[in-house]
Amino acid sequence: MEKAEFQVIIVGGSIGGLTLAHCLHRAGIKHVVLEKASDPAPQIGASIGILPNGARVLDQLQLYDQVEEHIEPLSKATIGLPDGFNFSSSYPKIIDQRFGFPIAFLDRQKMLEILYKGYPDPSKIRLGQRVTSIESLDDGVLITTTTGHVYRGDLLVGADGVHSIVRREIWKARGIARRVSKIKQDSSKLTVEFRCIFGISSAMPGLKLGEQVNALFDGLTIVTIHGKDGRIYWFVIQKLGKKYVYPDSPRYTSHETSIAAEEIRDVKFYENITFGELWDKRETSSMTALEENTFKVWHHGRCVLLGDSVHKMTPNVGQGANMAIEDAAALANLLRKMRISSGPYFPTSSQMEFLLQKYRDLRYERVNTIYQSSRFLVRFQVRDGIIYSLLSRYWAPYAGDLPADMASKTIADGTMCDFLPTPKRSGGGWEKYSKQGRSWSYLTQLMIYLFGLTIVYTSLTMMFDLEGALKFYFLQV
């Protein structure tokens, strides 16, 4: 059947949603973005980390120069432990040297503003369009919003975050298709074990530009990133007393946020600087539950997900937004190839199903590996139990370049737009640390390393005291 023009409806003017709009514009594919908020770039107190794999796509879209105006590249990280021991790592600088892009943070508001203002046709980004209903047709989807507007498209993309209405529609449709047990199992795996107070503070004496501080405590971690003009991006992650299953996860008011902050006011996170001093300098702040999961179901019919709507991770690895950016590039790559191969004809439902399954297959393993890294790191940084406590005190200080190597292996296989030129700024790390160049994943290597640690630790504790045994082991490796 001949069609006028294939159209993609993107629900959510998020980082991933707006990046997809840019990618589709470059690919020549008709699209529209429906954003429920009236402000395309609200200030909610959040920051965003742009790592080389996300930066590379933004550079392809000619947006990274604007990002660079608002960042202070990280060069050093300082890690502090409860007993007063601290050490430094130059892994941020190493990453910059390996990939040609730094690890950098900026206001999430500013990133959204860059994506929104940098888009060439604002009429395609519809604000104040909260989706109220989604109707799946044989050859498309029909979307109705609170304003009464009706949008018809050939593909619906849910870039609408962890509380995604598109994901609910996919679960509903899959359930009707008699996959109820699988959907219930998938939906129940979105869990919450941590909460995060996050915010942005003005410059403080003693916190140097381009540096990051990770203060590790039992059940708590405080992270600060010192950005452009001394602007401090920070988050405090705390272990909760119980495990919640979505959607029964806690929601927090501003009053509850203030109470939680006051409870840790006197905690020193760097030298003699207390969290209370950082809190008093805040420009904006909030508190949220940290959901965790990579869903197995990514699509149904003509509906598909990207970003936090399908994979939600804690902020510790800084890859959440970068994964959404990669999702956008991967989906745009496939849609462009489909458009070229289909010519003037619209692809059949089975062809669309094949394309969306291919998108899921291309992304799932990579996203899930980084998600597992996030699960490991958040528990490591809050010293969640004896193993993580031992690792933070007796493994991390002696790990050398291993943290940089681990990060490099998650960065190197990043997806970019295959129909746009590769950025000129680059480094040898993309090839050296790519999956093709290694036989084991870094998590496998880490598990083998930790298994060896366990055996040696057990043997040594028979002869030495605990601290002496661990120091002896790490001085030998």
From Swiss-Prot:
GO terms for biological process: paxilline biosynthetic process. Pathway: Secondary metabolite biosynthesis. The active site is at residue 195. Its main location: membrane. FAD binds at residues 35, 49, 108, 308, 321. It is found in: Membrane. Disulfide bonds: none annotated. It is a multi-pass membrane protein. The chain crosses the membrane at residues 4-24, 446-466. It is an enzyme of class 1 (oxidoreductase). Its EC number is 1.-.-.-. Belongs to the paxM FAD-dependent monooxygenase family. PANTHER family: FAD-BINDING DOMAIN-CONTAINING PROTEIN-RELATED, FAD-DEPENDENT MONOOXYGENASE ASQG-RELATED. This is FAD-dependent monooxygenase paxM. It comes from Penicillium paxilli. The lineage of its organism: Eukaryota, Fungi, Dikarya, Ascomycota, Pezizomycotina.
